[in-house]
Amino acid sequence: MVATLRSLFARRFKEVPAVQDVSFDIDEGEIVGFLGPNGAGKTTTLKMLSGLLYPTSGEVRVLGYTPWRREQGLLSAITLVMGNRSQLLWDIPAADSLRVLQEIFQLSEHTYRASLDELTDLLEMEPLLHKPVRNLSLGERMKVEFAAALIHQPRVLFLDEPTIGLDVTMQARIRRFVSDFNRRTGASILLTSHYMDDVVALCKRVIVIHHGRLLYDGALTGLAERMAPHKLIRVTLSHEADLASYGEVVSHEENTTTLKVSREAAADRTAQLVHDLQGQMLDLTLEDPAIEEVIDRVFSEAQVALAAGV
């Protein structure tokens, strides 16, 4: 039966480039968001940058080193944090795992204690150090994971979904920690996350890739300006009013209406609203659409272009 099935079916192999023609530089002390849908090539890129994967073409340089050579000078200066992976020993206290890392990175007792004290203060994790890792909650474990990843005070951080699965409060704490660590040490950080709150809070610059290709590299604020053809006008009046003549009504709640207008017409429509509704207007804001909406539009347009062979 097995032989019969083998005669009916044959393996076919297809090469799918995970990353192609992606080129960027990151300055010292910069925090850059690295965005893309699942399967875009983000984790593959981080693995090449950290030396876990060998690039089949092109060149990768981090701090002057070629990552796949795994030289000690590079390994002692970088770290990779993956939200769904652990580098802690499951059955022993977190403090013992950190001691193991002290030996791996050959840290002096003075250097180790200074780094541990700083991380313990930043992460508020003193009560967690003497608990077996298996007894920690996900949020508690991520605190210790960060301590383990940063105990050697790396100059470059690759953060792959560091807040995945965490509650809103813990996400905010991790963001504050990353920001504080960057400010204190001047470390360069490349961050992937599907939580746009992470990106907005930490990154002034974003890189967007899709199907392994670079779509955008620039200021986060410029992403909406370049990719979103409309803006939102939110108007609050002293009484109910129909504002459909000024733009597309996106939402209406009590006396507050949100209008969608083309980017080119936004200034004129805003001025027109102020002129026509003076004496009735309590508040008016002009803003870009949410970053999630902009990113979704970028991916959708890229998918259409890919299907069309553009």
Regions found by a protein language model. Give the residues of each.
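Conserved ABC ATPase "signature" region
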Residues: 2-8, 99, 103, 111-128
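Conserved ABC ATPase signature
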Residues: 91, 132-136
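Catalytic Walker B motif of ABC-type/P-loop ATPase nucleotide-binding domains
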Residues: 157-161
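ABC transporter nucleotide-binding domain
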Residues: 175-262
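Short, charged/small-residue-rich alpha-helical element at the C-terminal edge
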Residues: 231-302
